[in-house]
Amino acid sequence: MKIKIILLSIILVLLPTSIFAQKQDASAVVQSFYKFHLSRSGIFNASEVNARKKWFTDDLNKLFQTELQREKEYLKANPTDKPHFGDGFPFQPFDECESAGKLIKNTYQVGAATVKGEKATVEVKFYQPKECGGDLIDTYKVELVKSNGKWLINDWLYSDAKTLTEDLKRTNY
């Protein structure tokens, strides 16, 4: 009987810790992704998609590969037009402000994860730099799924209730 009580006590102590670790891990993945993403070119091309693929689910990676092919075909037929992701990856609002003739990037804040089983949602808030007012620009939600014990990004939910995967699956280029 004492052993059962001790084991139950250990389980009750460790359970909240493991739940916290899951939340922390999902947020840490998003934080790591944005740190990497913002350290590189935001240009949407095969090299940059491949550089980010370790953070994405297989499904999201496939959608990006399909988009690259669609873009290639579109540009072949319309060489002077801007492609759909011609302004770069849609992982953040258009950023930068100008202060004293210098272009200054926006800042971001990664929130805590909301975990439900094998899915997590992490809120990311984007702010103007302090030099440009520091106001909140937009909030995105990053959806993650657990695959082989690892959190992977599966989608972005934008403030207008549209998602990245919906955009990538659009019928018309």
For the regions a protein language model found, what residue spans apply to each?
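Surface-exposed, charged secondary-structure patches
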Residues: T57, F64-C132
